[in-house]
Structures are given as structure tokens and as C-alpha cells.
């Protein structure tokens, strides 16, 4: 089953709204500029207000471009070690906070695409608790991989193990490999360092972020797992790490 999602703004440029009512009449079930954020808060406010009247959600790619400008991977110890410019968690979180506030103001349904940070999960959880119409998704790669995968063979490999069984009751404490900071059942492959297959948007985050996403999925803060499918040609990937097209 395939359902169309219309663009929020013309050309996904973040400036002028599309003819949302006509697109809903034509069959669109939601609106998104996914891949590009709606940076202007006034434009997003208007989009949410119209969407509320039309009874459809806005799906938001949350990224503050002034904070993520020039990024190659998640900002942290690994990016420093590899000499790559970072995309801080705050670049996602400040826009999640903004869009939740605007959804609360307008009464609209906001859907946060590809949440990747612990702070983002916390913001969505708090908004749900106070009754904001917010839903969220996470991707398989953000639920299972960390920024250590960018290290590839520079990291310390350990023997793979079977994934843990689901918890029977209460919160399960996850065991980590101290050398890698990864779940014991998930370890990096022998990828070369700077392998561009690990460059995605938003970037692979820290182990703490993965833990928070999994906990959010378990407690209902994260409503869905979405692929965020972004296929690219070999030409787009076989280049310098920071210039490679992000996506899996």
C-alpha cells in the first residue's frame, strides 16, 4: 500500500507553502519537506495551522542548519579523533523543541521524522505527557549502529554474540563492551575507516542515544520504525567522506 505525502513548501525550499488543500483533495495524507528542514518558524507555524484545519499531520525533518553546517558525522570524541566536522545533537533537538511548541500552539499533529538523539526522545516523551499531538519515528540504523562504525577497522573488533532476549519484566540493563561502548551483541564489521556507507542524515549517534531510542520504542515514545530509505549511486558514495551523499 502506497500513500502520497505532499511537500510543505514549494520546491522544499522552506519559503512558500504549497497548495495544501488541493493536495489533500488529490489524495495526500500528510505533508513533509523531509530531507530539508522548514527553517523559518513563521512558515512552519502557518503550515501547522493549515494542516490542523485539513486534519492531516506535518512530518518534520528537524535540523538547525546553522548548527549542522558543513557536518560529516555526529559531533563527539569519534569525530574529533577522525578530524571530521560534527553535527551536534543540539542541531536536532532545538528544532524538535521548536516544532513541538508550534504544534502545541496550533493544535496540529506534528510527526518527528528519524529521531536520533536521547534529548529528542526526551522532548517527545515530555510533549506526549502534556497532551501535545506529537508522534515520532526512528530508523533501523539509528536503533542499531553508533558513530563508532565510522571508525571501521580502527576500532577494536570483538566476537559477535547473540542478541539478548526481550525483557520479561521491568527495565533491562544492557551490557556493553567496554572497548567499543556498543551493545555486546552488536559490533562493528571490518569496514575501512571513513567508509561512506556509514554516512547518513541525521548521523549515527552515540551509544547513549541508541539506548534512549530503544527505551523510547519500548515505552511508546517512538511510535514507528521507518527506513528513511535514501538510495544513492556509487558515484555519490565513492568520494571523500564529508562529500558523500548521506543515506542508506
Residue positions per predicted region:
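Metal-cofactor-binding active-site regions of metalloenzymes
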Residues: 1-15
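Histidine/acidic residue-rich metal-binding segments in metalloenzymes
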Residues: 15-225
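Gly/Ser/Thr-rich helix-start
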Residues: 84, 231, 248
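Gly/Ser/Thr-rich active-site loops/lids in small-molecule metabolic enzymes
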Residues: 92, 243-248
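Active-site anion/phosphate-binding pocket segments in diverse small-molecule metabolic enzymes
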Residues: 227-235
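Basic, amphipathic juxtamembrane/active-site segments
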Residues: 234-243
Amino acid at each position: 500500500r502506497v500513500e502520497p505525502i505532499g511537500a510543505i513548501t514549494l520546491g522544499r525550499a522552506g519559503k512558500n507553502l504549497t497548495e495544501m488543500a488541493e493536495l489533500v483533495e488529490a489524495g495526500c495524507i500528510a505533508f513533509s519537506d523531509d530531507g530539508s528542514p522548514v527553517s523559518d518558524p513563521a512558515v512552519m507555524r502557518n503550515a501547522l495551522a493549515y494542516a490542523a484545519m485539513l486534519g492531516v499531520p506535518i512530518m518534520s525533518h528537524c535540523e538547525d542548519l546553522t548548527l549542522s553546517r558543513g557536518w560529516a558525522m555526529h559531533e563527539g570524541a569519534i569525530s574529533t579523533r577522525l578530524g571530521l566536522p560534527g553535527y551536534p545533537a543540539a542541531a536536532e533537538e532545538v528544532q524538535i523543541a521548536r516544532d513541538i511548541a508550534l504544534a502545541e500552539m496550533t493544535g496540529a499533529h506534528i510527526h518527528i521524522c528519524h529521531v536520533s538523539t536521547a534529548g529528542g526522545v526526551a522532548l517527545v516523551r515530555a510533549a506526549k505527557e502534556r497532551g501535545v499531538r506529537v508522534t515520532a519515528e526512528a530508523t533501523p540504523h539509528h536503533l542499531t549502529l553508533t558513530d563508532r562504525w565510522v571508525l571501521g577497522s580502527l576500532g577494536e573488533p570483538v566476537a559477535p554474540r547473540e542478541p539478548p532476549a526481550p525483557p520479561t519484566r521491568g527495565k533491562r540493563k544492557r551490557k556493553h563492551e567496554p572497548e567499543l561502548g556498543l551493545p555486546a551483541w552488536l559490533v562493528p564489521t571490518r569496514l575501512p575507516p571513513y567508509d561512506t556507507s556509514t554516512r547518513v542524515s541525521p548521523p549515527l549517534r552515540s551509544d547513549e542515544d541508541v539506548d534512549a531510542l530503544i527505551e523510547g520504542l519500548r515505552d511508546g515514545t517512538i511510535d514507528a520504525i521507518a527506513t528513511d530509505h535514501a538510495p544513492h549511486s556509487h558515484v555519490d558514495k565513492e568520494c571523500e567522506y564529508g562529500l558523500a551523499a548521506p543515506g542508506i
